[in-house]
Amino acid sequence: MSQQKPRQRGGRVPDKATPEQVMGLARNLPLTHSVPGKAPEDATPGQLGFLANLFEKENASRAESKRRRLPGQAGFPQSRPWRDTTGGMASFPADRGSEQPESLEFVDRDEDLVLYGDVGCGKTHLAIAIGMLACQRMIPVRFFTASSPVMRLRKAQDDNRLDAELKSIGRAGLVIIDELGHLPIDIDGARLLFQAGADSYETRSVISASNLESGRWGDVFGDGDMAAAAIDRIVHHGRILRFHGESYRNKHSLMK
């Protein structure tokens, strides 16, 4: 009785390959430039059409998978879709013209945005909604409360991997820092936060949400010079959205 020869790795695929064989091969093929480059020489028009359709669907599938992953990777504390955001409590600068934050044009230009106003006026809600829009448009986002990146950067510094942590933050196209000024930050933590902000200057957008006017940012950074430098960068390459009105939580409180 003759024995079946074992299938050799890298052997020629039969002309009448089964769908299972095709899928088995495709699973192990992160394609290089050299292989697809030879396809027009070896394939018939029908085969090229099939491959184009296959690759188009694969690209669409990967893009959709990435779109679903991005919100989880961003670290949003909760979901705040844009449709639930009115923006009615924020006043926009007069020079904005018809541009609104949801267009994300400021992200395309690597500009910064400061959301300033009293507690409970919707700053965090708007910041998350903008971040979720960015994720839908395939822009990587990182969301932090102000104390969180300080702790991460300090631990990274202690572990001699500060550069790696800064690069990790730097992979985002939009960084959101919430509650800036809610809790005091010591001078070393402020320097680390400033370094992360300096690395982002004109290379990615940063949204900062704070209830402190710029004149009190020295309280955040613990150093007037660092505060002045941070404000200078924002004035040069950013905008301020002012929030006003009664706190949403107070307005809808059950304790009345």
Could you tell me what each predicted segment is?
Residues 1-34:
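Charged, compositionally biased N-terminal leader segments and the immediate start
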Residues 102-110:
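Phosphate-binding P-loop
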Residues 23-77:
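Interdomain "pre-motor" coupling segment immediately N-terminal to P-loop NTPase/helicase cores
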